[in-house]
Amino acid sequence: MYREFVYDGAQHFSIMQVPDIEQNAIMIDSVSKRFSMCGARIGWVVSKNKEVMKSILKFAQARLSPPTYSQIGAEKAFDVPETYFEEVLKEYTQRRNVLIDALQRVEGVRVSMPKGAFYCIAELPVENAEDFCIWLLDQFSVDNQTVMLAPAEGFYATPGLGRNQVRIAYVLEKEKIQRAVEILKKGLECYKKQ
């Protein structure tokens, strides 16, 4: 889903490129990520395994279709020139750099530079990120503003991993990302005092 969103000269590698596993390889993609069409629930599955595709087709035929306007928009999205992705990647690279730079300046926060997509996982100086995220929404604000973070534990298959981590999407404008990190920093300072 994020093949256009790779950074720093890296090249996307698809499971579909691995020889001799065609019958075990499935690729899933969607317009919501590829073309930033949030809410457009239109995607596709690619596989050379005919039995898998036959089963998926049965499931797809039993489902209602996405709204017509989403289908029309998705069709038009494929007409965008390749330069669209170059511009989008340039913007997301800048947003990523702003976010990571700002997070690295917050005491106790550990974060790595993402190589793809438009999210980062940040380790916070808290025991339970989910409790902290709820607290941010329910009990904390700066000038009547707060931030909404996704606890990262739910993104791991192993129970307990990511317990003190959050996933942050860098989909907002750079100025809003900087403001969000300022609020997060103040939130962490206040949370520690409890």
Which residues fall in each region the model found?
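PLP-dependent class I/II
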Residues: M1-Q194
